[in-house]
Curated annotation (Swiss-Prot):
Keyword terms: Cytoplasm
GO CC field: cytoplasm
UniProt entry tagged with the keyword Cytoplasm: yes
Name under which the protein is recorded: Uncharacterized protein YOR385W
Species: Saccharomyces cerevisiae (strain ATCC 204508 / S288c) (Baker's yeast)
Annotated localization: Cytoplasm
Additional comment: Present with 504 molecules/cell in log phase SD medium.
Length: 290
């Protein structure tokens, strides 16, 4: 299997993405290929950057934010930038997000601004690169679990529609997105998370009773869980650099083979990428505490 990078991912079974047209699977999950999205750190800059493809990441390492090297597809700049909030009072009062995710948007220089609150990173006679607030993540810690609510200022959605739940003393995370339920499954000794779709017959993932979660489906026919994405640190840079790859997200999607830049990433892939960026940050925080 090869990602959008054109590089072999070495283990076809470990990093496979399910591609199916079965009517038991939501149509939005009928994928034609996978997108390999590096997550990187930039020396002197807080947070982590998510790139739309390996090619885009490789180009950025050479050009940084040099607008003269951009093309109409937006190859060579990050897609997202996730940072942790240090507003202590805001966290106590729950009036401030715990994480912010910013999105880079490429426009023609003659195009009107898409958002009133945006930061122009650079521009020339053809393109303008802007940075906007894309997602706010609020953490709600309870005794048995921590809930992460994703709020997209540019979208209208009911509360809890975009959410990740992490139960205490467990590494798996369960998410809700567009009415679908997913599980980021990881083995105890690994940092390789597999993103799996959960069908309708699965018991409520927020139930903390392990025995209840493992109860059989009582003979109902149901679609099997199947893998639609991965988070892995296998391909990260060993030695620190000015721009260092920390991990990869491999996400299934339906798109054209040459969809490499920030302008052609499907909405669903972007939403999964936000979840993957949060997972990366949470693992970083765990390692710093040890």
């Amino acid at each position: 299997m090869r990602g959008f990078s054109g590089q072999p991912l070495s283990d076809d079974d470990n990093y496979r993405i399910e591609k199916t047209q079965r009517n038991t699977i939501p149509e939005r999950l009928h994928f034609s290929r996978e997108r390999n999205m590096p997550i990187a750190s930039i020396f002197g800059t807080r947070g982590y950057f998510v790139f739309s493809s390996e090619q885009s990441y490789d180009k950025f390492k050479q050009t940084n934010f040099n607008i003269s090297t951009l093309d109409a597809d937006g190859v060579g700049v990050p897609l997202f930038h996730i940072v942790q909030s240090y507003n202590v009072i805001g966290k106590i009062t729950r009036s401030s997000p715990d994480f912010y995710i910013y999105k880079y948007v490429l426009q023609g220089v003659q195009d009107p601004p898409l958002y009133s609150d945006c930061k122009v990173i650079c521009q020339d006679k053809v393109f303008r690169l802007c940075k906007i607030l894309y997602c706010e993540i609020y953490a709600h810690q309870g005794f048995f679990e921590t809930k992460y609510d994703f709020f997209y200022p540019s979208k209208t959605q009911p509360v809890k529609k975009y959410q990740i739940i992490k139960q205490s003393n467990m590494r798996d995370l369960y998410s809700t997105l567009d009415g679908m339920r997913f599980r980021w499954h990881v083995k105890f000794y690994s940092d390789h998370f597999r993103l799996m779709f959960l069908d309708e017959d699965r018991l409520n993932y927020s139930n903390s009773n392990q025995k209840e979660r493992q109860k059989p489906d009582q003979g109902k026919s149901k679609a099997p869980d199947f893998v639609i994405g991965h988070y892995t640190r296998t391909f990260s840079d060993i030695l620190p650099r000015s721009t260092s790859k920390c991990s990869n997200l491999i996400i299934g999607e339906h798109s054209k083979p040459d969809s490499l830049g920030i302008t052609t990433v499907p909405d669903l892939t972007q939403e999964f990428a936000c979840q993957g960026a949060l997972i990366h940050y949470l693992l970083h925080i765990e390692r710093e505490r040890k």
